[in-house]
Amino acid sequence: MDQSPLKRNEKCMEHLDLQVIKQGLQWLESGRQIWLCTVLTTFESAPRGPGSMLVAVPSGENCGSLSGGCIEDDFLDRLKLGQFAAHNQIVRYGDGGLQPTMALPCGGVLDVLVERFEPERSSIDHFRSLETALVGRDRLSRTINLKSGSRTTGPHGPTGRSVSRSGEDVTIILGPVRRLIVAGLSTVAEFCAEFALALGYEVIICDPHPERLIKASALLPNAKLIEVLPAVFIAQGGCHAATAVVALTHDPRLDDLTLMESVRTDAFYIGAMGSSKTSLKRMDRLERIAGLTTQDMQRISAPIGLHLGSKTPAEIAISVMADILRVRNGIDRAAL
């Protein structure tokens, strides 16, 4: 087996945002007019957050999600009737927006930006820049002027709200899809991968043992399984600022090398499984042998995860993903 992912449905492994942009680009390149919808704000309960996207054509074909399905159906029905002829417009669902007013089952309210794109060079170039941002390493901002209809893109820093509005300008931030690198297979690792996929992460499992990967491929069809040492994959550019790295094997030969490479990257989360005693020994070993600094070691969560009294592999995986979610959302551990 080589060091490429095991063969599987590549589309299933792609984050939904990337699927939306790729589908829109495909339709534009084939000469079809498209509509791109983006959730701008949500009030009360809402199944999808700001930045969620859906792309559609008048025939009803679509890709993406704005809600649990009710908004999508209503939008597609109205699109077929030609109700979204404007270059762009903001539509409110759930609170007296479109007539007849549509109440959402969850009781929430969503503001959705609806943009019409013609199959022309400027539209194709715009979608290509969005695709590049989603598969790349850097965040990109796209600004839409509601009055003039102009659309511009540019680089954006590592932090900031996904959607913002200033006067007639709406700014939407896109960037690398959240990624989880699982360093070595174990039962806990398999549960972590499963939960991460449910949270919308791109999951990459690196393990040098082909027999383990073959077994896991049936359990995790939407993860990328690569026969390679995790440290090698990371050293070759496997991490970006939206990446979390978890070492869950209890094998110091695998885990230590992974941690040594991970602290040299922009990964937002690095963690290793083990008891408090094991973790102290590991940190001492990394300091002595690998020359990690205090700052390097402070980036490593060990023991990994939140203290939830977890015992079973699934419970441990929940604590790991909960801690990753905490860090990603900027919540201090002391605030829990």
Can you annotate each of these PLM segments?
Residues 64, 68, 247-251, 271, ...:
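Glycine- and other small-residue-rich loops at beta-strand/loop junctions that grip anionic moieties
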Residues 73, 190, 253-256, 280, ...:
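Loop/helix-junction capping segments adjacent to catalytic residues or to phosphate/diphosphate-binding pockets
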Residues 206, 244-245, 249-255, 260-285:
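ADP-ribose/adenylate-binding Rossmann-like module
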Residues 210-211, 231-233, 254:
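Short acidic loop-to-helix transition motifs that present clustered carboxylates
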Residues 230-241:
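Short amphipathic alpha-helix with an adjacent loop that forms part of the alpha/beta core around
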Residues 267, 272-336:
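Adenosine-phosphate binding glycine-rich loop
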